[in-house]
Each structure stands twice: as C-alpha cells, then as structure tokens.
Amino acid sequence: MEFDYTCARWRRLRHAVLVAAGWRCQYFRRFGRMVEADRVHHIWPVEEFPEYAWCRWNLIALSLEAHMKMHVPGGRGLSELGEQLRRRTIPPDRR
C-alpha cells in the first residue's frame, strides 16, 4: 500500500516537523549551514517500515538537496548516507 503524502494527517505532521526544526535543514545544520527545509524525510523508509510512518522520531526536516542525498537516484531506496542515518536512528521498540 502506498503512503498518502496528500492526506490532511500527513500535512499536519509534516508542518509540525518543519516548525519544530525552525524550517531549517537538519542535515546541513550539522555543518553550520542555515538552509531552508521544505521536505520531511522518513529515516526508516515507509515502504519497508509502515509501522513507523507516523512516528515523530522517524522524521527529519531536510532541504531538497539534502533529501536527494538520502536517496539513490530515482528517489526510491536509501543511499549510503541515508542508510547511515537510519543505522544511527534506533526505533524505541528495538532498543
């Protein structure tokens, strides 16, 4: 089943994540760069882990450039950088 990125629940959650991040990209912030965030990324991909789709701990505010770095070309699947972030983000039910 495809995740519905157009539903009201997702739009509210996405907005809350962006507001909490101050509309700043959390990837580039690590390097001292203040870049506007306009995307919310599922650290644990929703296609593989739908049980984590609505979890705040699984969401990060990113710029388009940073979001593209998290995925392989074409947008499906995580890049090595995306996999590194996923490995560092341990779900509460796996601790």
Which stretches of residues belong to each language-model region?
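Surface-exposed loop/turn and secondary-structure junction residues enriched for glycine/proline
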Residues: 8, 13, 21, 46-49, ...
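Short Cys/His-centered divalent metal-binding micro-motifs
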Residues: 32-33, 59-84
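Histidine-centered nuclease catalytic patch
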Residues: 29-61
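Histidine (H) residue identity feature
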Residues: 15, 41-42, 67, 71
